[in-house]
Design a protein with these regions (language model features):
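An N-terminal assembly and electron-transfer interface module characteristic of large anaerobic redox
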Residues: 1-133
């Protein structure tokens, strides 16, 4: 699971992960960035089972959050799935290029091995506290 708050180009991230053997089943995003339109079309053709979920629809807040054994990349993906295994970064956190990919891979391993409490971290973020990230 990937969400659009994790990185400015979530579809490119999904493509990178999928083409390197990772399982990506859902992307949370509200619109397709024009810069990612070709990637979106490629994903639709190559991975027709990939689902796209909006984050701004009110009914998303009421959905059951019971997907505990998944790795979420981004806070919204963590919130909507209910998993405690998530990478807690926003807007790429300045990670760029090969070194950024390498660091994200390390954060993915860490997120799978060490649980976090999404309700504590994400709700604190919503209150505007500085210590959430």
């Amino acid at each position: 699971m990937i969400d659009h708050t994790f990185h400015p180009r979530p579809l490119e991230l999904a493509k990178l992960l999928l083409t390197h053997g990772f399982s990506v089943t859902r992307i949370y995003l509200d619109a397709v960035n024009p810069e990612e339109k070709a990637t979106f079309e490629w994903l639709k053709q190559q991975y027709p089972g990939l689902s796209y979920e909006p984050t701004i629809h009110p009914e998303m807040r009421m959905r059951p959050r019971k997907e505990e054994n998944v790795l979420a990349i981004g806070q919204k993906a963590a919130w909507f799935t209910g998993t405690k295994h998530f990478v807690n970064l926003v807007e790429g956190a300045g990670l760029y290029g090969f070194d950024g990919i390498r660091k994200v891979a390390g954060l993915m391993i860490e997120a799978w091995q060490e649980e976090k409490d999404p309700e504590d971290l994400i709700i604190r973020k919503g209150w505007g506290c500085e210590s959430c990230i």
